[in-house]
């Protein structure tokens, strides 16, 4: 293993004993706003949170305060340990919205008709289409800090291209003074291409990590190697496997964290030095992989938030709550893996992907990088994370620029990757120190029909913390575009899918959506007659009766930004891996992520909304009639009951929202009762009539 083997030899030259974790922790411009309809959550506060909660102040004061706070970390390539140590004291990982009631921006009115027409004449058509009045108003009415809330299918990218065209056409900025930031390379490349085709100019459009890499390399050594995620994950995996095989105390701790059953089963044998790992035990292999995945994810978030194991101990002691003990054990397991990870890129003077933005912030703070931008545009702003926010903030403190952000709070679905919804909900509070903040909405969509717009909007807006938006389709077709299809068994649900596919046009484009990748198993297990050719690796599915039909399976997360004629939502069931998913979060990881929202299943609701809005013509809910999703009950009872004709739902548990199932009394077979399908988490029962 080369470097890794040398490092691990030094690390475990003697029997490894987890170190005990310490039991104690070391000691902008006024804008019109409107109160949120419901009281915001009361999250825990940190120094960073309190700073954001302060009243608006001048950019000069904000700049001096921020530089004073970050002075200890103003370096780019020096000791990772020192950087992490200073960061620990500031708890950078713990961004939480402030405990005061969040105030939301007032929607700006549209510009007068004559002004809109003048602006439209200057901009012209964008990608062969005229911009809407809402888009023109957002472009010409933009302030120093602008948030454009653009719903699904309303033309977010077109608005960004139009704004750049406006800046160039009016001579407000040159191409070199404009930066466009996106979250994926594919979207950044598409943005760059569309801007060039529309304006004839080359505008810098890149991801946050690409910008971070550019900053790091321009500030230090051009050829610093990138330590890719595959290599980093292998370092963590190899270190874990080595310790698991060669260290008794580490092995016992790992078994305990995997499962109490595994610990009971192997605890005696695991204390032997020549213990052989039970690799033929399915449960062991499954738990081991889950533990490795959790460790890799936690370490990546530690790096992206610039916090080390000592900082994690501090966070756990302050905010671990009932999970403090379990988190301590997880930290003991992760500590040597984290050191192996850090040593791997530090020895090679490399740049790891999770730490790329952290290093870039240091380069900006110490002045080794100077940016040339007057206008920065951010696409998909709802996906902003705390490290990305801090990079933008550091750039503005160095040399201010106008900020133009386009996003949709209804489609914020990446908390597990660090995205923080409060960065869009608290836009005014966060950015008003730099100047006036303004908000516009774009609500006209032609992607899907009004019936789906109304149902999906009513569904997502049951979370009252989100901005109110009223999307509409000007074509206003009256045909209903939602339908629930049910089945009590997998075979029944498979058959209703086949029946509907036979009714669709032979060249239709179709998405089969799941909450998890494993949801494709419905199609695989029931495909006994060979009706489909299924490629699990790509998700491509060929319906042999209609070979020209374009069918693809993917998860709801992966479908964001896509659209197809017809969508089948396969996972309308309850349970741990249902929709909403109720799989508990790793508590140690939760310390590194934004605060969980008070609205139950808030992000799962937004993810369900994203899944609903992928179709252009018709959406089919494939309902498990033995254990329907609680979202199905919500649609059935409160939003669109008419789509459930022919699909009867079982009674719903009033305690937890899961389905009730009819059961027979063991002592008296003639007596029956309803029990919650969420048992043992929910023990609700009621007598059957």
What spans do the regions from the language model cover?
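Accessory N-terminal region flanking or inserted into the helicase ATPase core
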Residues: 98, 103-154, 158-159, 177-179, ...
């Amino acid at each position: 293993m080369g470097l890794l083997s040398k490092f691990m030899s030094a690390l475990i030259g003697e029997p490894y004993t987890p170190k005990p974790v310490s039991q104690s922790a070391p000691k902008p411009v006024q804008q019109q706003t409107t109160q949120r309809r419901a009281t915001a959550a009361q999250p825990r506060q940190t120094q960073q949170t309190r700073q954001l909660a302060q009243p608006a102040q001048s950019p000069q004061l904000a700049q001096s305060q921020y530089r004073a706070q970050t002075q200890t970390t103003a370096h780019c390539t020096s000791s990772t340990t020192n950087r992490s140590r200073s960061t620990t004291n500031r708890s950078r990982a713990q961004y939480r919205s402030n405990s005061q009631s969040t105030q939301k921006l007032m929607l700006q009115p549209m510009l007068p008709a004559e002004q809109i027409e003048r602006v439209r004449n200057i901009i012209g058509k964008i990608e062969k289409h005229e911009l809407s009045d809402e888009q023109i108003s957002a472009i010409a009415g933009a302030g120093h800090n602008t948030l454009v809330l653009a719903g699904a299918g309303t033309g977010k990218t077109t608005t960004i291209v139009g704004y750049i065209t406006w800046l160039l056409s009016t001579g407000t900025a040159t191409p070199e003074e404009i930066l466009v930031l996106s979250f994926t390379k594919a979207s950044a490349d598409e943005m760059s291409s569309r801007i060039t085709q529309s304006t004839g100019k080359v505008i810098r459009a890149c991801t946050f990590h690409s910008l971070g890499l550019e900053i790091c390399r321009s500030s230090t050594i051009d050829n610093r190697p990138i330590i890719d995620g595959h290599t980093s994950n292998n370092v963590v995996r190899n270190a874990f496997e080595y310790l698991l095989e060669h260290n008794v105390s580490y092995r016992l701790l790992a078994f305990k964290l995997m499962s109490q059953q595994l610990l009971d089963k192997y605890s005696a044998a695991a204390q032997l030095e020549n213990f052989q790992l039970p690799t033929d035990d399915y449960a062991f292999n499954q738990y081991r992989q889950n533990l490795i995945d959790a460790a890799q994810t936690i370490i990546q978030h530690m790096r992206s938030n610039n916090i080390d194991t000592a900082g994690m101990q501090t966070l756990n002691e302050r905010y671990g709550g009932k999970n403090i003990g379990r988190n301590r054990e997880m930290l003991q397991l992760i500590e040597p893996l984290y050191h192996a990870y850090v040593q791997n890129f530090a020895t090679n003077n490399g740049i790891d992907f999770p730490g790329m933005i952290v290093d870039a912030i240091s380069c900006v703070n110490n002045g080794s990088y100077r940016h040339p931008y007057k206008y920065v545009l951010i696409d998909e702003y709802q996906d902003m994370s705390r490290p990305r926010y801090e990079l933008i903030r550091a750039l503005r403190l160095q040399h201010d620029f106008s900020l133009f952000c386009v996003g949709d709070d209804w489609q914020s679905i990446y908390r597990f990757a660090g995205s923080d919804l409060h960065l869009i909900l608290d836009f005014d509070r966060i950015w008003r120190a730099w100047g006036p903040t303004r908000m516009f909405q774009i609500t006209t969509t032609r992607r899907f029909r009004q019936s789906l717009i109304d149902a999906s909007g009513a569904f997502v807006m049951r979370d009252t913390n989100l901005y109110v938006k009223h999307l509409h389709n000007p074509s206003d077709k009256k045909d209903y575009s939602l339908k629930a299809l049910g089945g009590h068994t997998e075979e029944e649900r498979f058959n209703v899918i086949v029946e509907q596919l036979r009714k669709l046009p032979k060249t239709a484009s179709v998405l089969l959506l799941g909450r998890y990748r494993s949801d494709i198993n419905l199609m695989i297990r029931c495909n006994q007659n060979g009706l489909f050719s299924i490629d699990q690796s790509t998700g491509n599915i060929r319906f042999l009766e209609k070979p020209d039909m374009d069918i693809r399976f993917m998860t709801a997360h992966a479908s964001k930004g896509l659209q197809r004629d017809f969508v089948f939502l396969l996972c309308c069931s309850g349970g741990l891996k249902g929709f909403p998913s109720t799989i508990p979060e790793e508590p140690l990881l939760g310390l590194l992520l934004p605060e969980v929202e008070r609205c139950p299943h808030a992000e799962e609701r937004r993810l369900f909304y994203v899944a609903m809005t992928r179709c252009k013509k018709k959406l089919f809910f494939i309902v498990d009639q033995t254990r329907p999703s609680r979202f199905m009950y919500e649609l059935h009872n409160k939003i669109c009951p008419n789509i459930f004709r022919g699909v009867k739902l079982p009674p719903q548990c009033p305690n937890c929202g899961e389905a009730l199932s009819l059961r027979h009394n063991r002592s008296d077979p003639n007596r029956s009762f309803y029990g919650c399908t969420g048992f043992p988490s929910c023990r609700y029962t009621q007598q059957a009539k």
